Amino acid sequence: MKTLWQHCHVATMAQGVYSIIEDAAIVTSGALIEWIGPRSQLPSGEYPAVNDLQGAWVTPGLIDCHTHTVFGGNRSGEFEKRLQGVSYAEIAAAGGGIASTVRATREASEDELFASAAKRLKSLMRDGVTTVEMKSGYGLDLASERKILRVIRRLAAELPISVRSTCLAAHALPPEYQDRADDYIDHICAEMLPALAAEGLVDAVDAFCEYLAFSPEQVERVFIAAQKLGLPVKLHAEQLSSLHGSSLAARYHALSADHLEFMDEADAIAMAESDTVAVLLPGAFYFLRETRLPPMEALRKHKVKIAIASDLNPGTSPALSLRLMLNMACTCFRMTPEEALAGATIHAAQALGMAETHGSLEVGKVADFVAWQIDRPADLAYWLGGELDKRVVRHGVESSL
């Protein structure tokens, strides 16, 4: 059915800029955008359903392209200890850190993981998020990684949001493989990835390239295994040190390389040449009180597309608001509100391999958009917290939580 949405202004985000249409109208047909433009040029015809958006600013639905939404337990106690002077090493030695999340996730049932993740996901959805990526990586064995990925598929089936599922088995070394990282990588490549891919649980494969995780050589083995299975790759890279993981990601035409505080200009050039998206995660930068900024000028100079995501996770970015991340990207990384909004729409879509169908408001694309009662698009990165008055449309149908 054709539906007309009118009396609005639109920031289409085509080509990664606002691309504003004043006094606009949008015609949707089923789940797709059939026409968009100035209301004065609206094609004549019958529109069975007409919606008055009352002067709202319409943007594409927000896309959170890097989250770890599904996990067991809670690490707020560790947060408190760190602020009382206990070091991360001491916390880890006492069984805390990522090991505690792995234990809690392994012990939790699928239903328990679903219930806790659904609450977190609904918080993102109330922020205007219509598409989200979720990673495994807190199971670190086949059964537990499968459990997480099954929960991700279930969330996609039961909540009105589009979901991409990423296997991050190469996130950390599980306790049963202590001091045997190469053996664990072998297990991922030979057993875990083929089994999980065969079950249709994986849309992409990620890894953590860092001195406290996996080496570039080990990550490359994961990439080769993923590509043999026809799966695109992504990478956590250059968060804490420079191992040139982002250049490795570019060599394998990764969808994205994420974090990137320690990347250099050569890495930026490599990413530009492969059109690999730089996903910046200001929540983790803020929460860890980091001081090394991503090389914004190099990214801009070489025209690397920049996305912004929440990195929602229990250890380093317990962030339930993507809009807050837009503000942090502006205040911490000195991005403009326009760059930040592109980072949570069209560039985030590219980081998920979805830019042909999502991320901007153009004819033929999926009709996912938000009508915000705001004064200008920059308000999305300006206001800190709180719920903005809005209407959310997903696949051409108004959605509510």
From Swiss-Prot:
Listed pathway(s): Amino-acid degradation; L-histidine degradation into L-glutamate; N-formimidoyl-L-glutamate from L-histidine: step 3/3
Binding site for Zn(2+): H66, H68, H236, D311
Catalytic function, reaction form: 4-imidazolone-5-propanoate + H2O = N-formimidoyl-L-glutamate
Binding site for 4-imidazolone-5-propanoate: R75, Y138, H171, Q239, T316
Cellular localization per UniProt: Cytoplasm
Top EC class, one word: hydrolase
Residue positions binding N-formimidoyl-L-glutamate: Y138, N313, G315
Chief location of this protein within or outside the cell: cytoplasm
GO molecular function: imidazolonepropionase activity; iron ion binding; zinc ion binding
Cofactor: how bound: Binds 1 zinc or iron ion per subunit.
GO biological process: L-histidine catabolic process to glutamate and formamide; L-histidine catabolic process to glutamate and formate
Pfam family, one: Amidohydro_1
Chain residues that bind Fe(3+): H66, H68, H236, D311
Similarity field: Belongs to the metallo-dependent hydrolases superfamily. HutI family.
Purpose of the protein: Catalyzes the hydrolytic cleavage of the carbon-nitrogen bond in imidazolone-5-propanoate to yield N-formimidoyl-L-glutamate. It is the third step in the universal histidine degradation pathway.
Protein name: Imidazolonepropionase
Organism in which the protein naturally occurs: Pseudomonas fluorescens (strain Pf0-1)
Annotated gene: hutI
